Amino acid sequence: MLPEWVYHKCPEISAVHRDAAIVRQAQLTKPTGALGRLEQLAIELAGLQATEQPRAARVPIIIFAGDHGIVAQGVSAYPQAVTIAMMANFASGGAAISVLARELGSHLEVVDAGTLSQDEMIGIVTDRPRHGTRDFSVEAALTLAELAFAFEAGERAVARAAASQPDLLIFGEMGIGNTTTSAAIAASLLGVSAEEIAGSGTGVDAAGRAHKARVIDAAIVRHGVAAASPEKILCAVGGLEIAAICGAIIAAAQRRIPVLIDGFIVSVAALAAVRLNPSCQPFLLPSHQSAEQGHRLVLRALNVQPLISLDLRLGEGSGAAIALPLVRSACALHNGMATFAQANVPDRPA
């Protein structure tokens, strides 16, 4: 079992505030439904945040990084050293998510949840049980104790962020090989073949995708994790940064903080989180559908519809960051528009 808190129930949606938001939307100076999904987004946030005025102003971004032993099987187009180099790039402000965080006014924290780095890095929070996972094609990626540590690292990151009273949280990831790990987790959770899930990741070609799928399918058989418990799956084929995000999602939901879900890898972490603690599901707000072919299946399993689809496949939390202005617009429109009565506008056609 994982730490006891992982299974604690999350708060329920405030029906009072959700229903009040529905009433307000019907009173705003626009035809019913004219703002499309932005209306429902504002209503959902009002219920999740238990407020009459949903907010998306304070949105910290937390990036979890980890390395993957499965890279030894030639599943990635880039060398493992890129993980550490990109962590330094995050910290120095040169990565895509660094630029987006500045543009959005979001605090960016980077957590080394399990990279191969042997040194403390300036601007990086180190919170890891080991240096990278084991190669899951030959042995289990993690022990239960290591998995539990990663969940606790995610909870600690959320506790730090919660001190600033955030309206939402965005989680991102970095780790060469983590699309393979995520595909293995998703295929195991969904009980489907890796061929249906595995995508190009950092840019492998068709032959590379086929090889990745074969490696994953063989590992699922080796460990006997097809449709197994999420705990068993995460130990067998998981990743430290992915496990940390699982823990962070549950910890955020338990604090009534909605999470704007990023792309394929974070969505897989979200699916595992929901399987572990179904009460966190309402707090997941999908941002985008990525170019990774398995993302659509994972979103369907989560029963959510993304806000945008721009063929992104960068990760880092970038898709969620790009979608955040839409969430802010939904809140601003809900809170700031005049009602028919305030504007002295007839509320129905003549």
Swiss-Prot record:
Active site residues per record: E316 (proton acceptor)
CDD domains linked to this entry: DMB-PRT_CobT
Entry-linked Pfam families: DBI_PRT
GO molecular function per UniProt: nicotinate-nucleotide-dimethylbenzimidazole phosphoribosyltransferase activity
One Gene Ontology term from the biological process aspect of the record: cobalamin biosynthetic process
Gene3D superfamilies noted in UniProt: 1.10.1610.10, 3.40.50.10210
Known EC number: 2.4.2.21
Enzyme class: transferase
The entry's keywords: Cobalamin biosynthesis, Glycosyltransferase, Transferase
Domain of life: Bacteria
Pathway participation: Nucleoside biosynthesis; alpha-ribazole biosynthesis; alpha-ribazole from 5,6-dimethylbenzimidazole: step 1/2
InterPro entries with a match to the protein in the record: Nict_dMeBzImd_PRibTrfase (IPR003200), Nict_dMeBzImd_PRibTrfase_bact (IPR017846), Nict_dMeBzImd_PRibTrfase_N (IPR023195), Nict_dMeBzImd_PRibTrfase_sf (IPR036087)
Recorded catalytic activity of this chain's protein: 5,6-dimethylbenzimidazole + nicotinate beta-D-ribonucleotide = alpha-ribazole 5'-phosphate + nicotinate + H(+)
Family note: Belongs to the CobT family.
Primary role: Catalyzes the synthesis of alpha-ribazole-5'-phosphate from nicotinate mononucleotide (NAMN) and 5,6-dimethylbenzimidazole (DMB).
Protein name: Nicotinate-nucleotide--dimethylbenzimidazole phosphoribosyltransferase
Gene it is expressed from: cobT
